[in-house]
Amino acid sequence: MLRRAAAVAGATAAAVVGWSLFESQWVEFCDEEVELRGLAPELDGLTIVHLSDFHLGTLSFNARTLERAVRWASERPCDIVAITGDLLSRRRGEPQLERAVSALEPRFGVFAVLGNHDVEITRDPFSQPTDASVVQSAGAVLLENESVSLSVNGRSVQIVGGDQSLGPYWSSLAGLADPEADLRILLFHFPDVVRYLPPEAFDLILAGHLHGGQICIPTPRGRVRLEHLRAEHWEGLHETRAGFLHVSRGLGTSFVPFRFLARPEATRLVLRSAGR
């Protein structure tokens, strides 16, 4: 009896590990429409590919999932690519990062911010800071508490990139928003930034960090996520007082190369005028 129970337990554990390795490569490609109140008609249909949390350089399938996401993004019309941090976990992933970012060719450019793994603000003792020049040489615009303005069909689109090193001063990001811009987008690694921003600070906020929990346990009351238990917005689209928030589950894994009930994700957001 004990041997049979041990054999069943061993087989179950092996199946879970095998599935978790498979799921870490099983990228979900999403097309989502985001209805924004007051969006100018000239900006209706603007497309943004949101990518996050590559965690390149680790012993994992992270580079493979990023390659698939880049290939998917390159096959679709895209105006802007937004990358919301944790690009690298080890410097040995720099060549993979350069290849991936340089292969992206959106109409108006690739814009990125750094995450906690990029600047060693992490529990990972082996994490190495990301060299900003690597991101820039690949063709991305790296935003660190600064903004750029784009002219899109005669309308002004402002993209603000926040640096998490602001710590308790995240609310100051609202001061970077241009009230005259027709569309204000914030790129920030942590979704919790919406708790610190004033009402209607931005029209659209893009974040990552949480990996959708990365490893989740199913229960009768829903999934229990083993990381960041106090998080309010785990994944997907949310209407918050600070602005419309999209949280990406990201493409990579951290600490362990597994995902369970939290597939990696690449999303193309199509902006629409609410009530059109």
Which ranges hold each PLM region?
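N-terminal membrane-anchoring alpha-helices
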Residues: 1-42
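Alpha-helical scaffolding within the catalytic cores
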Residues: 29-36, 97-99, 142-146, 171, ...
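Mobile, glycine- and charge-enriched loop segments
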Residues: 33-60, 162-188
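Beta-strand-turn-beta hairpins that frame and shape the catalytic cleft
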Residues: 36-49, 140, 147-159, 180-183, ...
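Membrane-embedded segments
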Residues: 42, 46-141
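Active-site metal-binding loops of divalent metal-dependent hydrolases
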Residues: 52-56, 85-87, 116-118, 146-147, ...
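Binuclear metal-dependent hydrolase catalytic cores centered on His/Asp/Glu-rich metal-binding motifs
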Residues: 122-140, 146-147, 152-188, 192-196, ...
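Conserved beta-sheet core of the metallophosphoesterase superfamily
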Residues: 191-270, 276
